[in-house]
Amino acid sequence: MKNIVFIPKVKGTDEKRLREVAYDLSVESWKRWCDKNDCQLFVMEDLVHDYDYMKITWQRYYLFDMLDNNNVDYDQVLMVDADTIVHPDCPNFFQMSEHKYCGVNAVGSMDWICRSIENYSHFFFKDVK
């Protein structure tokens, strides 16, 4: 069993082509990191549902189903966005996690975070006012 780095990178429409170049760089950086640290890179290239039904930001949470359906045996899994680039000398964080659920604090846009909480909270916290 290997540790898995999971990246959703589904081809977009023509107006999203410029982003894909950056996403290719991201995938390449993670591929090199995985090779260096004896991990397996798993790139989600196909949608699970039509994009109009469910955005990719939600579809990525099917990752365990995708790994199981592709007969991927895994120890630990990292889910990372395709707009990240890992430093080539980044330590193998799988060796630091103690097999616990871990996350990173990503404070890119506080406005986006606040709007997300306001707009999605009623789906998850129906009783909270």
Which residues are covered by each model-predicted region?
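N-terminal anchoring/stem segment of glycosyltransferases
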Residues: M1-Y74
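A broadly tuned preference for mixed-charge, low-complexity surface segments
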Residues: K2-N3, D127-K129
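Short His-Asn-centered micro-motif
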Residues: I7-P8, E45, V80-A82, P88, ...
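Surface-exposed, flexible loop/turn segments at secondary-structure boundaries
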Residues: T13, H49, I85, S109-M110
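Short linear motifs at secondary-structure transitions and domain/linker junctions
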Residues: E15-R19, Y51-M54, V77-V80, C114-K126
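Conserved beta-strand scaffold positions in the cores of enzyme catalytic domains, especially
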Residues: L41-V43, V77-M79, Y101
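Short beta-strand-to-loop acidic/aromatic patch adjacent to the donor-nucleotide binding site
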Residues: F64, Y74-I85
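Conserved donor-nucleotide/metal-binding helix-loop-beta segment in metal-dependent transferases, i.e.
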Residues: V86-V128
